[in-house]
Amino acid sequence: APGHSFQGALALEQQALPKFRRQTYFSGFGEGWGLYTEYIGEEMGIYRTPYERFGKLSYEMWRAVRLVVDTGIHHYGWSRQQAVDYLASRTALSTREVNTEVDRYISWPGQALAYKLGELTIRRVRAKAEQALGPKFDIRKFHDVVLSLGSVPLPTLEERIDAFIADGGQGLPGVAYP
C-alpha cells in the first residue's frame, strides 16, 4: 500500500462519496497514512541496508521530537531558540532544516502533531482489528476499508474500523478478494 499519491488518488476515485469528501484533506489522516506506510515498509522488508534503516529511524526520531517541540512552543511557552536547540540536539536535521521546521511549528500550531498521532491511530485500529478478527483479519481488506473513506477525521476512521470488525472483516462490497 503506497503512501500519499496512492491515498489521494483513491480518495478522488470514490464516486460514492460527495465531492467535498473526495477533496477534503485532514492532516491526521493523510499524514498519518504517509507515516503508516513507512511503518509497513518495515514489515514488508523494504529497508534492507543499514543506511536505509538508519534513514527510516532518523525520520522516525524527527517525527517523535516534533511532538515535544510543538507542545513546548504552544503549551509551555518555549522561545524559538529553545525549540531550535531541542530539535537540533535530537535529530539529524541540518541547521537550515531545523530553523525552517521550527518556524513552521510556530506558525501552524498542532499540524506537526498530526503526522505521528495519525500513524499511531491507524496502527492502533489495525491492532484492534487483528486482535478482534484473529485469523479472519486480512491486511488488504483493512487497507481497502481505510482508503475507501477518503480523508476523514481520526474518530471517523476508528468508527469505520469498528464497523469493519463488527462485519467480520468482510472488506468492501463488490470487491472480489483472492
Regions found by a protein language model. Give the residues of each.
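N-terminal maturation segment of proteins
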Residues: 1-178
